[in-house]
Amino acid sequence: MIQTEYANIVKKIAIENGKEIFLEPKKLKAFLSDHTKNEYKEENAFLLSVLNTDCIKYIDKAENLAECRQFLLKRLNDEYGLVSAKSSEMLDMLFLVLRGKKVESLDESRKNIARFQMCISIGYNAEGSHVVGLKAVGKVVAVGSNDSGQCNTQQWRNIVAVSAGPRFTAGLKLDGSLIIAGGTGSVQINAKDITAVSLGNSHIVALRTDGLVEAIGGNNYGQCDTQRWRDIVAISAGIFHTVGLRGDGTVVATGYNDYGQCETRQWRDIVDISAGFCHTVGIKANGTVIAAGDKAKWHCQIQHWEDIVAVSAGMVHTVALKADGTVVVSGSNDFGQCNVQGWRDYIAVRAGLFNTVGLKADGTVVVCGDNKFGQCNTQSWRDIGLTVD
């Protein structure tokens, strides 16, 4: 992190009459020249050197700050020979002081994105598909197949997260309890200390505040055998398997494993997970993605992905969100579910059977792919995932 004291010293010049303004490079150069301190000699020298290059014009015009930072680090090294152990931190401060914008680290981006990932979900099977969205006021909207009442969420209130299964939808309430719509019969979890929920084909998985996992419902493949799991911080239910992320970055999995989708024992430094049908994917701390399972179809391109902050494994494709708000995808595109090339400013993504769902920063939702059941008809949705005063 940038040294707080030094950052405050540099920012003092940006305060006039109690109101914060953003500096021009010339004014910042004068300030740095007049405020040299021995303990900040290295920082001042580096910043002054950067301000004397043409790199400032890129900071001034940059739309994607994270990409601009990487570009400038390389340019400063290759073209100007400017290298410092704190180069990245100093550039971050230039963005903050000159543009008034903070460049988030991958870890910060992932933490911010995580709550938005819980605001959209897609349930699917061979006979139907539906999309669910959580509105800012705690209400839930749903569109698509409703043969079992899975879209009957109109009366829900105080919801903080949603998850969709093939014929049912789950909402996590503010008090830590669950509410279910659709054809689950007597399948219910009555605990009130739940922090996350994920739905499989016929099973419900819930993460408790104590790091334990409850899983009930169909267990023909052992997908509910989570009783021995401990220190779990994230969960994901696939069609017939369940995956859990431990606090130490390792991953546990149980259930259907004919394609090797549960072979995650060797995974390390994982920060997020997603279970699909024949594969499981995880994000590593460095922003790359790892996969287990049927790699022939769904893993072929992900080894080149970088700066990933969210990932979702579908039935026959995988979709991921980059730190810059763009979306990458790999796998089958038979129904156009991979047509995300022009997507920008997204804050959450989900993969379904033949669909990809994306939540934009403005609170709208876009769905591409098959629309046989009307699951793409989200054009009227507003304020999904946003905070409203």
What are the roles of these predicted feature ranges?
Residues 150, 168, 173, 208, ...:
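Intrinsically disordered, low-complexity repeat regions of secreted/extracellular protein precursors
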Residues 1-110:
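Charged, amphipathic alpha-helical regulatory modules used
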